[in-house]
Amino acid sequence: MMEILRGSPALSAFRINKLLARFQAANLQVHNIYAEYVHFADLNAPLNDSEQAQLTRLLQYGPALSSHTLAGKLLLVTPRPGTISPWSSKATDIAHNCGLQQIDRLERGVAYYIEASTLTAEQWRQVAAELHDRMMETVFSSLTDAEKLFIHHQPAPVSSVDLLGEGRQALIDANLRLGLALAEDEIDYLQEAFTKLGRNPNDIELYMFAQANSEHCRHKIFNADWIIDGKPQPKSLFKMIKNTFETTPDYVLSAYKDNAAVMEGSAVGRYFADHNTGRYDFHQEPAHILMKVETHNHPTAISPWPGAATGSGGEIRDEGATGRGAKPKAGLVGFSVSNLRIPGFEQPWEEDFGKPERIVTALDIMTEGPLGGAAFNNEFGRPALTGYFRTYEEKVNSHNGEELRGYHKPIMLAGGIGNIRADHVQKGEIVVGAKLIVLGGPAMNIGLGGGAASSMASGQSDADLDFASVQRDNPEMERRCQEVIDRCWQLGDANPILFIHDVGAGGLSNAMPELVSDGGRGGKFELRDILSDEPGMSPLEIWCNESQERYVLAVAADQLPLFDELCKRERAPYAVIGDATEEQHLSLHDNHFDNQPIDLPLDVLLGKTPKMTRDVQTLKAKGDALNRADITIADAVNRVLHLPTVAEKTFLVTIGDRTVTGMVARDQMVGPWQVPVADCAVTTASLDSYYGEAMSIGERAPVALLDFAASARLAVGEALTNIAATQIGDIKRIKLSANWMAAAGHPGEDAGLYDAVKAVGEELCPQLGLTIPVGKDSMSMKTRWQEGNEQREMTSPLSLVISAFARVEDVRHTLTPQLSTEDNALLLIDLGKGHNALGATALAQVYRQLGDKPADVRDVAQLKGFYDAMQVLVAARKLLAWHDRSDGGLLVTLAEMAFAGHCGVQVDIAALGDDHLAALFNEELGGVIQVRAEDRDAVETLLAQYGLADCVHYLGQALAGDRFVITANDRTVFSESRTTLRVWWAETTWQMQRLRDNPQCADQEHEAKANDADPGLNVKLSFDINEDIAAPYIATGARPKVAVLREQGVNSHVEMAAAFHRAGFDAIDVHMSDLLGGRIGLGNFHALVACGGFSYGDVLGAGEGWAKSILFNHRVRDEFETFFHRPQTLALGVCNGCQMMSNLRELIPGSELWPRFVRNHSDRFEARFSLVEVTQSPSLLLQGMVGSQMPIAVSHGEGRVEVRDDAHLAALESKGLVALRYVDNFGKVTETYPANPNGSPNGITAVTTENGRVTIMMPHPERVFRTVANSWHPENWGEDSPWMRIFRNARKQLG
């Protein structure tokens, strides 16, 4: 039976207005829209009155409900029948944890009530299309239609392909019907293999073969033999990449054979809990560094949010599945798309060349894609710390004559670093009889054929297959799986994982054969043991779907009870689906039909399939010299600062958590004004050291339209000039990931790809001492479509994205572009040696030109000398600032440095030649250093010692004030206010935020950037930051116990434990499953802290599902109530823990006036470094801190304080229960965005109880208790930041 329960409004007022505007633009006469959530409960037995009331309360979440009279035509959007949404699985979990076992399943839809003039049936179809994602959702016309969500279909049988009867044609037909993307020689191979086996292939076997042997999975082009201009080439592309490792194997522990590469890290204290006692402690050992960068281009073109989200999720799984299990740590992201053409903000260089129907626009990609990637990282709990964004779309005269070049098929880059134990770097042996396990969520009928689909140019496959090949995301599930992997590797020698791979392209059909084959075994599997949410799926769909958040593992049979225990504690689903066999054979049995859908020797599937040969011709681009007739420097500056590649990226940065882990030493946002211009990202290796890891990106794709090899060399060079900002030491410590994107088969591109790979693999990297131990290729970067009577193609430039990774010797020495106004000198290091080439620059692009000669690496020895000199200067603390020269040239380098420093610049460029335009806008390698005036001679002397004398030019200095002045021999070349330039640079991000988020918030933020008087973040302390008030108590040797409480989806518990540990506590890991299972009680704890994250993925309201699992479970409710009523206890709730505890008001004495925390006013997840003041309150944790004003990490989507009415707010204030408030940079309490990131009234962001024993706050003090973890801080802070005082106060209070 199904029960229907109404929920809260689903759309904010500004979202409704945006939707109405979209309908008007499509000429659909819709006058009004109201949308609310509707819940559907599938019951196996009726609920009694008490249970009914409990369910009703469970489904009351989000902003307070206001009465609304429903009017208009109903369009009900629900998940697709036959699927179970991530929301459903988590909401059902919560219901069961609350004791409501009569509920088989909860599901949620959005009921849209549309008031419109008379619309035709076709127009109503258009309206419906605007309201749902056809990939994951459907539209019903009545609420009762939702019963279809709970219909269980009968399993479908396997089907065979009549090869023996119909011959080769049967395979050709199956190839088209199933979208297998098989080549002619592969069809021949399969015909021969199955004829030899004497039987017809099943569809599942062909599908499995196609996925496992797709270009996406097998990298056929990179392993191919090459003939160029009639001459056979000596090496494959992959062999040239491997040459970098053969030349420089230093520090590499694993390359080319696992899900990620591994290099040597630092010996530090890794902090985690003991399996038996739950007690957190430091474990001194090497934290080796793993690195991986993926792309997810095809799915992002079809459906950007899930495409980018699952791209990030897949790369995170690659990291976790390295060796015998590893820990993902920090991420990077990148996007290349065609022109944005923001409505009302179109730029002079943006022409509309059309696009295929099946893919979305560049604007859609950049609106939804970054949100999807960020949301996955946020919910998983991985900070996203660096990235790139390029737009390019133009008709150009390139290698193949005049043609359209751009990124209709986008690049969506997802990468990152992690850490791994030394004894887990290499995978173990799979013993015969080992249990073969799928860890993670159930199989669902989504993401079919992703590997094959990604291997085709867009437009070659059927549109329905394109949509079928996109996956969907459930990051909270992936977090649960990662917690299991963490528990395994933390066991050290007792790690039960022998072998692990992630499930990606091709689903289990690729992952399981790869697992057993890599382990030298075969596998015997049972299809129906695979967890599945859709009973009607065929064997092909169960085995080959690409449902996300899954891993395949081999675990020895005697270790299965331990593995089971770990999974149950973390609530991570798993299934044993087979056994490892001695014979390298793959068999899959189907219990339901008692047949054998797969019965193949592994060498048929993964053996010597036909090798590709590429026979290609070279084409050379001539280019045309830049026509500069109508270009003025003033206009060029304005245009270049509006090019999205150059323009401010705040809209891409603040949506992503940049502080989770408490180990982020350098994020994108720089200085007191938080300007996104950092050259590289830096993390600490641990919570007890200054060793670290760095990441940077280099990419100069448009240059490939003139010179393939130069583009590749520049990508390496740019990654190097970016990462040189931190203290690494030996250049051989730097390892690169190379991600190659090309339109294989397009005239000239294959030979160009070979040139580019050779340039870096055989020449530049070996000469520099750099290794490329990891990478990926995407060889189908072209879209085709019909525009009227014309067949069109959009081909991307050959695109190499280099990501550089390195061990850092001291994270405190990292430089930023933030200028200082003390007596200083600005020096240009011009590695272009005066060439000043303007081909394929931002300047050329904004004037719709390509130019002829591009930048290049002019002198490899000088590039190496630059890096070595920088390392000496960084270590000696001789530099005040550094910023590389890249897109937009020297002009943009200087402008961004001035923005970060909120100061003026006075420079003279006479020494750079008479061509001022070329001097300011060329994109040759190099950058600007700022030194103290007194150090200038010594720095120039040192640079000369490293062979850079002819590259160094004194420019001028940074000055206090607002003027940005460039002269040549004292004649003004360009002069403007820095604030004006800052506003120009910010307009793209402003317009994107207005479109995507609450426009009122976007306007407020843009206005703040135009305020030259803004003093920036600043600190006022009412206490001595260096006084350790907990020291006397620590000296006694007594360590009170704090329960570090987490629920599934919580991700900030480790740094929280570390902060309490430092203050003298024994931090104990307590999962809600421990409390619900009765394994742990709260009676032995002196303090309790509820940590941040996304419990249950914020399903049923942020923190609300977690709270209700406490309130509706009598025994656990009693545990909490007893704890809160016990004297001499302390409790802290942070972020998700704050939201959760605000819903436990009925259990916490003195909390009756606490507010609720609901969706941010911006309607967006906000990651900010915000200024707060400590107010007078009873809070015992904030004693002695009143009046202090300091920045703190903020990361939440639902942090806005909601009170019942004005009287409620007044009572909260008058009782003195407000503990922290947001203030602006002038020190005034504020409700203005973004100083107040969520719109809370009177800046309220923390409250306490009347006795001060329980304090809850939305910001994260635990993430910034170390000074190095603060995005900006005063120079005189030592190891501990002021926020450490909270935790020491806790220790002091307990005596």
UniProtKB/Swiss-Prot annotation:
The active site is at C1135 (nucleophile), H1260, E1262. One of its GO terms (cellular component) is cytoplasm. Its EC number is 6.3.5.3. Residues 305-327 are annotated as: Disordered. It is found in: Cytoplasm. Keywords: ATP-binding, Cytoplasm, Glutamine amidotransferase, Ligase, Magnesium, Metal-binding, Nucleotide-binding, Purine biosynthesis. It catalyses: N(2)-formyl-N(1)-(5-phospho-beta-D-ribosyl)glycinamide + L-glutamine + ATP + H2O = 2-formamido-N(1)-(5-O-phospho-beta-D-ribosyl)acetamidine + L-glutamate + ADP + phosphate + H(+). InterPro entries: Class_I_gatase-like, FGAR-AT_N, FGAR-AT_PurM_N-like, PurL_large, PurL_linker, PurM-like_C_dom, PurM-like_C_sf, PurM-like_N_sf. Residues 1042-1295 form the Glutamine amidotransferase type-1 domain. Transmembrane segments: none annotated. Mg(2+) binds at D679, E718, N722, D884. Phosphoribosylformylglycinamidine synthase involved in the purines biosynthetic pathway. Catalyzes the ATP-dependent conversion of formylglycinamide ribonucleotide (FGAR) and glutamine to yield formylglycinamidine ribonucleotide (FGAM) and glutamate. In the N-terminal section; belongs to the FGAMS family. Monomer. This is Phosphoribosylformylglycinamidine synthase.
